[in-house]
Amino acid sequence: QKLIDSGLRFHHVVAPQVWAWRSGRAKKYAKIFDKLYAFFDFELPYFTKYGLETVAVGHPIADGLIGKYKSQQSEKIITLIPGSRMSEVKRLMPLMRDIVDRLVRNGYRDYRFVIPTVETTESYIRNVVHDWAVTPTLVPSSERYDIYAKTYIAIAASGTVSAELAMLHVPTVVVYKMN
């Protein structure tokens, strides 16, 4: 409050998602910030109605993905995305194994299962999947968008990836396992 009262101007990058919950919070932000930078055009009215100067600057993921990767579903690929943090990978891999087992038992044996991995989880995932009914192919994270474009369906951790898959029009089951 002292900084605000001192006359400093405050610019906030990435608008709080008041459109998702508690839209009335926008009024509070209008009292704090002098200017707000939002990802999407539809966010502007939530803040401008309270007099907060708000500018849509685009979304770094959406702007780079939408229209760039065309669906190429000639292969039968089911992509498993257990996340990028080791804690979530350890929590979700048993669930992913159960899902793969069920899919294989129910006629999806001829599908290729793929898991994009980051460097910090690749070794762990490789050790976990070696004895699955069908061993998934591991690919580096740098190739994930090419894989997503070929994906029939994805089973993904909740997070940024679910937004990426939606932008690429990949049918996705989002999974989350609580402690």
Task: Identify the residue ranges that each predicted region occupies.
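Charged active-site motifs of nucleotide-sugar-dependent glycosyltransferases
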Residues: 73-79, 111-112
